[in-house]
Amino acid sequence: MLNTQLAKAHGDFADRNPQSRRHYDEARKFLPGGQTRSVLTHAPYPLAFASGQGATLTDVDGHTYIDFLGDYTAGLLGHSERRVLDRVVLALSRNTSVGGVHPAEATLGRLMCERFGIDRVRFTNSGTEANLLAMTTAVVATGRKKILVFEGGYHGSVFYFANGSAKWNAPFDFVLAPYNDTAAALQVISDNATTLAAVVVEPMLGSGGCIPGSSDFLSKVFDAARNIGAVCIADEVMTSRHGRSGMMQLLGVEADITAFGKYIG
């Protein structure tokens, strides 16, 4: 019965969205899976969007939808927001890529440091890259190899821990602990006291079900990590929007390195 209903739903979807299907079939000739973002993969095929305005999106078949997703928190201001468009046009009218230092880089860096209470900031191309460089920095700085992450965690396209460590993850030496289980996490840290380079944690699991971490859990895990000389990394790519200075600040927990992303980019 379930398979029958699912097949009917797929058929109804296909009947309603023929132009998206045509786009999908054409895109698959050049793009693996027909697109470049794995999270968008679903049966029978993803919708293709032609435009967006405010809180709505319009697909290539002319259907308009209210956007409750906001590009996975990256689109907090909505689509085609006038102030953003004006600044983009102004920036593009001055240059596109100078291949050198631009004064706006330091201005944005100062604003980031002031807002989030950080010492310095390094800009990257994505949240995935920010976490990659944070982990690499910890490995180089400590001379150790292991990195503690948590079940259900997601730190980018090559750092996925919904069911253990995904086979396509970047080749770090990961050890896992249950999220929000302080005793279990402290035991893992103790067991790897001489080999642990870093602890990487989201203050709230994003892809793992929007489960908030407790202040007690986060602070005790970071304290234990510091006691053995490991680097404390907070992944705030999806959570920094929860407070003016990020979610960790709301919880009263300080990281050594913090990764930001989504709407900030």
Region spans (language model):
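Active-site-adjacent loop/helix segments that line or gate small-molecule/cofactor pockets in enzymes
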Residues: 3-51
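Short beta-strands and strand-loop turn motifs
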Residues: 7, 66-69, 198-204
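Conserved A3 ("GATE") glycine/threonine-rich loop of ANL adenylate-forming enzymes
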Residues: 33-35, 128-129, 153-158, 240, ...
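Active-site and channel-lining beta-strand-loop segments
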Residues: 46-67
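Glycine-rich loop-to-alpha-helix module at the N-terminal edge of alpha/beta enzyme cores
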Residues: 64-141
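PLP-dependent aspartate aminotransferase-fold enzymes
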Residues: 107-198, 205
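Conserved PLP-enzyme active-site core in the AAT-like
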Residues: 164-265
